Each structure stands twice: as C-alpha cells, then as structure tokens.
Amino acid sequence: MDRLCGSGELGSKFWDSNLTVYTNTPDLTPCFQNSLLAWVPCIYLWAALPCYLFYLRHHRLGYIVLSCLSRLKTALGVLLWCISWVDLFYSFHGLVHGSSPAPVFFITPLLVGITMLLATLLIQYERLRGVRSSGVLIIFWLLCVICAIIPFRSKILLALAEGKILDPFRFTTFYIYFALVLCAFILSCFQEKPPLFSPENLDTNPCPEASAGFFSRLSFWWFTKLAILGYRRPLEDSDLWSLSEEDCSHKVVQRLLEAWQKQQTQASGPQTAALEPKIAGEDEVLLKARPKTKKPSFLRALVRTFTSSLLMGACFKLIQDLSPSSTHSCSASSSGLFRPHGPYWWGFLLAGLMFVSSTMQTLILHQHYHCIFVMALRIRTAIIGVIYRKALTITNSVKREYTVGEMVNLMSVDAQRFMDVSPFINLLWSAPLQVILAIYFLWQILGPSALAGVAVIVLLIPLNGAVSMKMKTYQVQQMKFKDSRIKLMSEILNGIKVLKLYAWEPTFLEQVEGIRQGELQLLRKGAYLQAISTFIWVCTPFMVTLITLGVYVCVDKNNVLDAEKAFVSLSLFNILKIPLNLLPQLISGMTQTSVSLKRIQDFLNQDELDPQCVERKTISPGRAITIHNGTFSWSKDLPPTLHSINIQIPKGALVAVVGPVGCGKSSLVSALLGEMEKLEGAVSVKGSVAYVPQQAWIQNCTLQENVLFGQPMNPKRYQQALETCALLADLDVLPGGDQTEIGEKGINLSGGQRQRVSLARAVYSDANIFLLDDPLSAVDSHVAKHIFDQVIGPEGVLAGKTRVLVTHGISFLPQTDFIIVLADGQITEMGHYSELLQHDGSFANFLRNYAPDENQEANEGVLQHANEEVLLLEDTLSTHTDLTDTEPAIYEVRKQFMREMSSLSSEGEGQNRPVLKRYTSSLEKEVPATQTKETGALIKEEIAETGNVKLSVYWDYAKSVGLCTTLFICLLYAGQNAVAIGANVWLSAWTNDVEEHGQQNNTSVRLGVYATLGILQGLLVMLSAFTMVVGAIQAARLLHTALLHNQIRAPQSFFDTTPSGRILNRFSKDIYVIHEVLAPTILMLFNSFYTSISTIVVIVASTPLFCVVVLPLAVFYGFVQRFYVATSRQLKRLESVSRSPIFSHFSETVTGTSVIRAYGRVQDFKVLSDAKVDSNQKTTYPYIASNRWLGVHVEFVGNCVVLFSALFAVIGRNSLNPGLVGLSVSYALQVTLSLNWMIRTLSDLESNIIAVERVKEYSKTETEAPWVLESNRAPEGWPRSGVVEFRNYSVRYRPGLELVLKNLTLHVQGGEKVGIVGRTGAGKSSMTLCLFRILEAAEGEIFIDGLNVAHIGLHDLRSQLTIIPQDPILFSGTLRMNLDPFGRYSDEDIWRTLELSHLSAFVSSQPTGLDFQCSEGGDNLSVGQRQLVCLARALLRKSRVLVLDEATAAIDLETDDLIQGTIRTQFEDCTVLTIAHRLNTIMDYNRVLVLDKGVVAEFDSPVNLIAAGGIFYGMAKDAGLA
C-alpha cells in the first residue's frame, strides 16, 4: 500500500502507529485518508449494487413523477461527479507539468467519480421503480460524510500548523466535495411523494411504515404515533392501519397453495395434473384426489413460499452475529478500559465504539426480528387459509375422521405453533456460529484451554437430544389428548340442550376430566423434562467457564488469571450463554412444531371430493339429470349405500323420492351433488343447482343475508321468495325485520322457520335444478300445503324448473310428474302416481293403508283458501313470542273472520280478497308499537376489555398457583441471582490476587468455591423451574375445571346468545396459553427482572459515578414501558376478540359445506374467511411492530448503560479495582438484553394473563339451579302416577323479553295421553322446556305427582322425565354410549329397545354391533335413524312422563305408524305429552291441548274439539281428518 502514497506531500507511509495509536493527539496518515478512507463508501455501494438491483427489479412499487427533490439530488450527484473528474484532470495536469502526483491521486478521483455517477443513476432508477426513501443511498452518503470528517479536521489542523494551505486546489475541491455530500445526505433523508396509482393513495388509513423514511424504518419511529394514542386512550379497531397488499390473506394463501400443489404434483408423478379444470357453475378449483407415490412435503412448500423472507432475515442475523460488539471487539473494548497507563482517548474511543456497535447491533437485530415475525404472521395466515380451503373439499369420510373440534385445533393451536417457532428458525445455524466465534476468540485469550469448554458442550448435546426426543413423544401424545378434549367440548357445546334434557352432564363432565387428567399428566412429564433441559443449558455456560478457567490455571503455573483475561473471557462466555440458553426453547419449539407439521400435513393429504364425479356437460338432450348404472358409497372403505341406480329426469320435471327410513333417499340427493364416492356408473347434472337439506343450515347473520346467500339484491325476486315461502308476515314480528340477526345455527328460529328460510334461499337463487331433501317435514300441514302449492308444485314459482323432492307427505304425490321408490339402496319402483297404483306393488299397498280417504272433502274452495291464509297469518303472528308482544285476541278475530267468510262463501274467491286484506290490516294495526324494527341482534358482540388488567386477575392466578408456591419461586429466583453475583464477585476477587500479591494464591480453593457457587445456582434454577411447573399445572387444572364446571352448568339462554366458537376459544387457545405460554413468560420475567436489578447493583457498586445517570435512564425507561404496555395490552385484547370469529365462521362453514358447494359459493366463503383472518392480522401486525419499537428504545437505554459504565470506568480507572471494573463492564454488556426482556416479558405477561381474564370471565357466568338439593331430594320411585299440573304458569326466554307462556293452568291425569298442537311459536316446545326447567318460571308453578318441581334439584327432575326432541342429537362414540352413557343397562335390555324402535336390523348388519361408531352429530346415520335412536333412549329410561317433540317428523308414514304403536304399548301406563305436526298420530289420544300465543285456546278430547268447530277442527280439516 505504501507504493500508492508515493514520496511527495503524502509521505511514504500508508499507516503510522506512532501517529495514530501511541500519541495523545491521534491522526491518520494523509495517504490513508486519501486512499482507503475515501474508498470505503465506494466499496460499500459497489458491493451492495447486485443485491439492490435484484430487489429493485422484482419489487416495482409504481412510478414517481420527477420532483424538485429528485432534481436537486440528481444535480448534486452530477456536481460530485464533476468535482471528482476535476480532481483527476488536475492530477494529470500535474503529471504533464512534471510534479509526479502520487498514484492515489489518480485512483481515488477515478473510483469516486464512477461511484458518484452510479449513485446519480440509482437516484433516477429508484424513482422509476417507486422507491420513496433509499436506505442504500442514505448509508452511502452517510459513509461519505463520516469518512470525510477526519480529512476535514486534519486539513484544518495542518493549515493552522503550517500557517498556510499547502495544496490550495485540492483543499478547495475537498471542502466543496464535503459540502456537496453533506447536502446529498440531508436531501436523501427526505422522502419523495407516493408513486402514481399507489394503493397508499387510495387507502383511508394506510400503515405509516409504507411511507416511513429509512431512519424511521430502522428505528421503528413510525410506530410512535400509535404508541402515544394507545397511551392516551384504549385503542379501538378503527385506529388500526389497513394491511399492505403483501400481507393480505388472499395473496399469502395463494402463494402457499401454489407451492403445495407443486408438491402434490411431484409426489403423484408427472402424469397427474396439479389443478383440475373448473366445474361449470362453481367458482372454486378443487384438487382431485389421486393415489400418490409419496407424500408431498408441507415443510418444503412453506420454505419455498417464504424463501425470500427467510433469506432476508438470515442476512440481518448474519450481520448482527458478525457485528463487532457480539464477538472479539467486545473483548478488545473491555480490555482497553483496564490499562491505566495508556492514553485516555483509548478508553473514550473504545467506550464510544462499544456504544456505536451495540446500537448498530440493536438496529440490525430488530430488523431481523421484524422480518421474521412478519414472515411468521404470514405463515400462520397461510396455514389457516389452506386448512380452510381444504375443509371445503374433503370427502364425507374425512369429515367423520376429523371432527370440527380437531380442525379448529389445527387452525388455532397448530398454526400458532408455526408462528411461535419461526423467530427461532435462524438459531439453527446462528447458535452454532455464535458458539464457534466465541470459542475462537476464547482460544485467542486462553489458548488450548478453550477446548475444554468445547468438550463440555459436545458432551451435553446428546444428553439434551435424548431429553428432547422424549419430550417429542410426550408432545405427540399430549396433542392427541388435546384434540380429544376439544372435539368432545365441541360436541358438548353443540348438544348441550340434549345433555340438559337427559341430565347427562355428569358423564360427559367425567369424560372431559378423564381426558384432561391424561393431558395434564403428559404436560407435567413434559414440563419436568423441560426443567431438566433448562437446568442443563443454564449450567452449560457456567460449566464451560469453570472448566475452561480451571484448565487454564491448572495446566500451567505461568497462566495467570488477571482481570483482563477473566472478564473479557466472561463477556465471551455471556455471549456464549445466549444461544445456549435459547437452545432449550428452540428444541422445545421445534419438537412441538414438528408434531403440528405432521398433523397439518396428514390433514392436507386427506382425500378430496372428485370434481368430475358429476358431469356438467355431456348429458342426453332434454334430460336435466341422468344416472347410469350408478353405485355410490359414503366411503371407499364402506359397502355401497346405493346400488345400480338408473335415472333419467327430464328438464322441468317434478320428481318425488320416497321410501322407508335409511333406504337411501338423502344419499341419492348427495350423489347428485357429488358428495358421495362414485364406485361405478356415470352421473350428469346440467345447469346450476339449489339444495335444501333435510336439516336446514342457517348462517349466523341476518335473515336477508341468509336468503340472498351472496347474490346481489333483486327486490322483486327477493319479495317473491319471502312471500311464497310464507316468510313475509314473519318480518312484521321479527324485531329487525329481514335485518334480524339469526343466531348461531338459527337458534332464535323455530325448526319450521329455519326450513322456510332455507327454502327461500333456494327460490331466490333461481337455479336450474332444485334438490329438496324433505323440506316439508318440519312445518305444519297447512304450511306444507301452502309451500307445495306456492313453491314446489305444478303451479308454484318453481314450475318449469327441474325439482327432485324427497318427501314423506303422500298427499303431494299425485301432483308429481313421476315417483322414485327406494328400498335398501335400490330403486324398486319408478313411474307416475297412477302407474304405480296400477302396478299394485308395495307402494300401492302402502298408499292404500296410509293415504287419506279420497271421499273426504277436498281442500279446495273459497272458505278453505281463506282459512289457509288466516292459518298462515296466525302462524306468523304467533312466531317469536319471546321477541315481540302481539295482540292476544287472535282467536276472537279468527272466529269473526270465519263468520264473515261463511256468509260470503257464495260470492266467489274474487270478492274475499279485500276482506282478507282488511282483516290482515286490522291485525297489523293491533300489533303494539314495540315491534318497531330497532335492532335484530341476538348474539352479543364480544367486546375487548380496556385499561390495565385488574390486579384481581393476577391475584386469582397467584391463588391458583398457590400463594406459598408463588412466594417460594420469588425467593428461589432472588437466591439464584444472589449466588450468581457472589460467583462473579468471587471471580473478581480471584483476579485481584495478581494486582495485590503479584501472583495467584490458593487456586484450588478459589476454583472450588467458584464451582460450588455455580452448582448451587444451577440447582436453584432447576428447583425454581420445577416449582413453577408444579404451580403452573396446578393453576391450569383449577382454571380449566372452574371453566368447565361453570360452562356445563350455564343456562340454555347463555348458549343461545353466545357462539360456540367463542366458548371453544376459551377451551383451546386460552387454555393453551395458560398451559404452555404463561409459565415460561413468568420465568423469563423473574429472570430478566433479577438480572436487571443485579446489573444495576453491580455497576453502581463498581463505579459509584454511575448513580448520576441512573435516574434519567430510569425515567426514560419508565416512559417507554408505560407507552408500550398500554398499547400492546390493548392490541393483544383486540387480537383475542378478533380471533374468535375466525373459528366460529370455520365451524359454521364445515357444517354447511354441502350447501356451500351446491350453490357454488365456495369462493365467497373463502373471501369471507380471508376477511376475518385479515381483521385479526390488523391487530397482530401493530403488536409485532410494538415489540420492535420497544426493543429499539429499551436497548438504547441499555446501550447508554454500557456507554456510561465504560466512560466512568475510564474516568476512574486509576482509583477503581480492576476486577470490579471488569465485572461492571461484563454486566453492563448484558443489561441491554435483560432490560429489553424485562419490559417485553412484563408486557407479554399482561398480554397473556388476558387468557386468565377471559377464562375467569366465563367461569363466573350465571349458572342454573343446583343439580341436586340434598336437603330436598325427590321421594324414592317418584313420579309414580305421572300427574302433571301447571298452575298460573308464565315464562320468558330471557329477562327483558315478553312472556311466551301466560298464566298457563292445566291438569293432566297420570297415564293420560295428551297431544299438543298450535301454530309455529305458539309455545309448544317452550312448554316442554318448562317441564324440564330449561326455562325457569317467571311466575306460577309446575307440579308432578303433587311435588313442586322448582323445589328439587335439576337432575332429580330431568332424570325422571324423558323426551324425544325435535332435533335428534348424537355424540361421537359407540351406539351403546349414545343409548346408555352411564352403563346402567345390560346388552339384553339395549337389544330389546332396538327391536322395539325398529333399529335392530340395522345394528345387527353392522360388524361391530352395539359398538358401532357414531360420527360427530351422528352424521353417518340418516335423520330418521337418529330419531329412532332417540326413541330407543326413551324406551330404555321408561319414565312415567314422556314428551315427544315432533319426534317422527323425519320418518316415513309406515315407520311412524310402527313407532306410534310401540309408544302406545310400551308407554301404556305412562303420561305422554306429544307435540305433533301429523295430527293423525294424536287422533286417538285422550285429550288435545291447543296453544295459541302462549295461552290455552282449547283443551278437550279430539272428538269434542272437532265437534266444537274451533281451531283444532280447522287444523284437522286441513289435514284431511275432519
């Protein structure tokens, strides 16, 4: 390098130590200043150029119009280029004139000139690519300024020393150059305007990060405004920024889907296409399930999707690991402070370098973390989206294998695991790198003794590996328990009403607690192993230090351990400690994530529906539906459900499908939808499809949204759908009209209303083909007739459309075009009604037995038509008596109407319409003003708590852990930190031996005490970890038990108004946080708190001057802490609230996938799910940014601590003990991390303790009456007679609502059979709920056998009554469990009841018999079969009081007749209360109760009621029974 300097005015030396180092006035040689110092910015820019050009080429953000700022920056670049060339020409001029300039005067101007030209071109290229603030160029200009400062000073000092300027030309050009680069740097800090057509210009609340400058991005200053706002008031959702395009779900999910599809393609071989063509009429792309040669790797798909983010994060991490303060410069800086005879400026320079390098490390580290955490958020988002999309395409057999709860677990727990482990991914290579670097520099200081420490690390790795493998085993088992628990809880929440009616809560409670016990045992084992792993890795740095220093002083007596070696080594050991301490967390996280990865991958590899199962194009002319030789099964592993099906349905035909329960009617509809496995044959369906399932699927949204179902509003068509489906009048009594929010699963609608809404959805869709799976079973006979006439029949709005109607209503069959008769999965007969009668087969015999008498009066004429209209009107006005208060005088109005109609009947139909309208109007006028549509909300919105987490929450958790345990943990942590300080002070005293005695004495004693203190610290760490584990698991057990017991005892009204997803969120995510997040957070808080306190104490004790800056730094730290905690806490709460809708929507979607696919609305639901995930991301992204903002600002405080401790050590180096100074500096280098972690863990604690707050909230909700009152038990054998009596009984659904039963008084004799009828919402089901005390009395009493039911426990009551509910609910498990969960009955008893309930043939045909596995909700049984199972339950219990709530609505007439016979014989001496739609089933009952508007309208024998000509007579006449 000296040859570059020449021998002229620059001298002949490139570097001169006497000029630069060993002097009190340091300077650099002129040659160094004009060469390397000037080249540094150029080298940086050229090195960064390839990567930066690659980035600009692939990240076009728009086009920025040429502005004044851009012109100025360009002009400065051009001027700097000119200055460089002027310098170069001046050098050539000197050469020509014989002055022989040094080579550096040619090289430097040439290099700088070319670099300035490059910078100028980059300015314009950035503008064209839409870059508003260039970090690359800002660093370049900053380096130019910094590298020019030293020549700036040197030239002035030289001129002053010489009394003249030696080279006026270069002196002048240099200061012009300095002024220009300073201006360029200042201008580069300003931002350009947003690019044209930038999303930022359209967004009302864009994220400020997008428009932030380089330094703002680097320091996260752009977050400050939100931090201040969050400190001033609780943040709201409207305060949060919009998501950037790159973070939106649809974009992130699509990228992962493409990568996953490539994996599937590679796995299935080149012959398999990744994507199947789109199906006509559908918006989604379904993946075709094909046999695969190998399983696709989801991990590879993730890596390929997020490679760029991983690499960028890795680059930041690599720079941070190699930064000076993290390795040898840390040692060099520290050692310079211990030299009392060197120049003072050495210490000040090294202190400054420590501060600058620490600050750079902070900024780079948090850029790394921001990049990785944003990637982690995107990974979670992508996984949720992929799982959601997969759930829309899985087969029915997969749905039976994976319950809703298990799939929710995949989205909540498993996806979150990926987000939690992502920040540690780079430790896989970074930790070994840091260890290698630390050991390398230890070698430089201690020589081969450093290898002893390496040996310790190598020996401990297999031990920890064995521990981690065992932990993985426990983790897999624990996840299975967790899945089972969440699955069971999901079923309990979905079937909670049935559990209450049957008093089955204890057995399911026992099941949950049994699963929970196994889960906790595995958690405890895993946590113990985690504590052992923590002990190993906490002891590892100490063991390395001990053995390394011990070997060093023992192998050679000449090896002296002085302060410089000890504490430089200790600083390196502390650097070594960071990756080693993080390794247990990494191993634990990777173990858990590997389990989650396998679970997600297994789910994504499950079979999907074949989109080509149903052909949409190739079809016979004139045919809408064709099945040729079709054989179908619900699973490839199961025997066929439908055999040899051959059907051809013409366009516009109305086809009825009939047959007994379980014959395959619903399966045939599913086959047409492509929901079954097609084993043989071909299916063709031409045109769009609308599907009305047997059990209506209703969304948790408004009635209008349920009907429109994603289609644009067409007022005329919408009005027609409501009118024909008899919903118009409902709107007058619903509190919000068609904007009324229908609760989860349509909870606030009756079964009939849900079915009519489902039918209205189909009508509004205006599809070509309508598949109607028994839509008339859930409605009254007159409503069924209206719907058939107005919608389905030959004169209905669907006339001309192709309709396939599954029905048990034989009165509609004559109006169909032809009928398909199914039996045992095969078509036995097919033809027109008259043809089948003439055929004289089984269908004809069935009709002769069950069809109404054709000689009875036909349901035609003016009177009947008007009566039907009034019945519909009454039905509507009686609806929702829990929501509105309609006029109670309906009966009188109806009688008046009937009298007038009788007198007008001869005048013809045309004249009775005005009368009808007039009476309709009069009824509407009599509806009170309380019906005004103010709000239709039923589900209570979940509102985030605000302000500080209440101290009572912390107190509750501390009590759950155990107050003594909590105090003991605090003492253990205080003890272990005191021991750690003692060990380091002892080491400090050890190093002072050399200073005081000139040699080291008692080395073995020193080493022994140091070892003892270290081992004691490790034991205290392990003991504290074990104690925390015991306390945390105790707390988790108590909190879960309290939550479970409270929720299972909550009243039914709570479940009606609270989405199950919200409750399930408490049992899944919040319990997970309490299990696995809260305890480590508390341990980290204790550790960082005591470490920070220890650090301050040691620094103050070592350098008392440090007290001067403690207060200012503490004030700044306090401000940052208060701003951060207030903001992050509220962001965490908002995130928790926004999380529940994701899982609620997912649960809702999974139950309605067949409907969603049938209507082709898959894409709409994807968009809706993405919107809910994006809403959650809007809260998570600021939370991530808040952590980075905190880190930068708090670590700045820590870096100031490092700076001031070093400065004060330099100032007082002549009077301070070198050992204590070394101890002070080594502690100061740790304080940055400990202060940061203290605030972060404190905030994390506040954020995570919210899980306790949320669990406690649902652990203290109002509960039902006690299950058992020991002081007032029911008598043995009660009830004996079954006498039921209501005395002035009134009830409402919830406080503040109107009464649904009003002063009900009636007496039912023991053994009496009573039918209960009335319009929808008249109070029939409410009456039965009151009998079971699902609803508690507002006033009045119910007596059974003279005992007031309100005076005994709920289980004493409910266990002695039996109900067959309207909605048959089964639970996953064996058939035996569903019949006898308590195991009270023998197999013989169960088989006898199955025989009586006509299920024995089906159960006998199953290989497992009574151990036949029912899927969740009983989905692998038909609705009719499920109702038969409910009948079998009733037969087993054989109570004295039996309630039938429309129990045979979904059963064919023949089976219904058999069941009614069974009930008559088996419950002959029991009191039977039957709510019936089919009036023929109660015509032989002792009495019939007619309810109207919650009051008794009629109560007498059927014969007397028909003779009286009242309401019951009208209903019987409609049904053809009078």
Curated annotation (Swiss-Prot):
- Boundaries of each ABC transporter domain copy? 625-849, 1286-1518
Q: In which tissues is it expressed?
A: Expressed in lung, ileum, colon and liver. Higher in liver of Eisai hyperbilirubinemic rats.
What domain of life does the native source organism fall in? Eukaryota
Q: Which Pfam families does the entry mention?
A: ABC_membrane, ABC_tran, TMD0_ABC
One of its GO biological process terms is: response to estradiol
The species this protein belongs to is: Rattus norvegicus (Rat)
User: How does this protein lie in the membrane?
Assistant: Multi-pass membrane protein
* Entry keyword Ribosomal protein: no
**Localisation:** Basolateral cell membrane; Basal cell membrane
**Positions of ATP 1 binding:** G659, P660, V661, G662, C663, G664, K665, S666
Q: Where do the record's glycosylation annotations fall on this chain?
A: N18, N1001, N1002
| Gene3D superfamilies xrefs | ABC transporter type 1, transmembrane domain (1.20.1560.10), P-loop containing nucleotide triphosphate hydrolases (3.40.50.300)
UniProt cross-references to PANTHER family, sorted A to Z: ATP-BINDING CASSETTE SUB-FAMILY C, ATP-BINDING CASSETTE SUB-FAMILY C MEMBER 3
Family statement drawn from the similarity comment of this UniProt entry: Belongs to the ABC transporter superfamily. ABCC family. Conjugate transporter (TC 3.A.1.208) subfamily.
Record gene name: Abcc3
Q: Which reaction does it catalyse?
A: an S-substituted glutathione(in) + ATP + H2O = an S-substituted glutathione(out) + ADP + phosphate + H(+); ATP + H2O + xenobioticSide 1 = ADP + phosphate + xenobioticSide 2; taurocholate(in) + ATP + H2O = taurocholate(out) + ADP + phosphate + H(+); glycocholate(in) + ATP + H2O = glycocholate(out) + ADP + phosphate + H(+)
Membrane spanning residue stretches: 33-53, 74-94, 100-120, 133-153, 172-192, 302-322, 348-368, 425-445, 449-469, 532-552, 575-595, 959-979, 1017-1037, 1081-1101, 1103-1123, 1195-1215, 1218-1238
Functionally, this protein is described as follows: ATP-dependent transporter of the ATP-binding cassette (ABC) family that binds and hydrolyzes ATP to enable active transport of various substrates including many drugs, toxicants and endogenous compound across cell membranes. Transports glucuronide conjugates such as bilirubin diglucuronide, estradiol-17-beta-o-glucuronide and GSH conjugates such as leukotriene C4 (LTC4). Transports also various bile salts (taurocholate, glycocholate, taurochenodeoxycholate-3-sulfate, taurolithocholate- 3-sulfate).
Question: What name does the UniProt record give this protein?
Answer: ATP-binding cassette sub-family C member 3
**Which regions of this chain are Cytoplasmic-facing, per the record's topological domains?**
54-73, 121-132, 193-301, 369-424, 470-531, 596-958, 1038-1080, 1124-1194, 1239-1522
Q: Which InterPro entries does UniProt cross-reference here?
A: AAA+_ATPase, ABC1_TM_dom, ABC1_TM_sf, ABC_transporter-like_ATP-bd, ABC_transporter-like_CS, ABC_transporter_C-like, MRP, P-loop_NTPase
| GO CC annotations on file | basal plasma membrane; basolateral plasma membrane; membrane; plasma membrane
Which regions of this chain are Extracellular-facing, per the record's topological domains? 1-32, 95-99, 154-171, 323-347, 446-448, 553-574, 980-1016, 1102, 1216-1217
> Which Enzyme Commission numbers does its entry carry?
7.6.2.-, 7.6.2.2, 7.6.2.3
Query: Main site of residence?
Result: membrane
Write out the residues that bind ATP 2: G1318, R1319, T1320, G1321, A1322, G1323, K1324, S1325
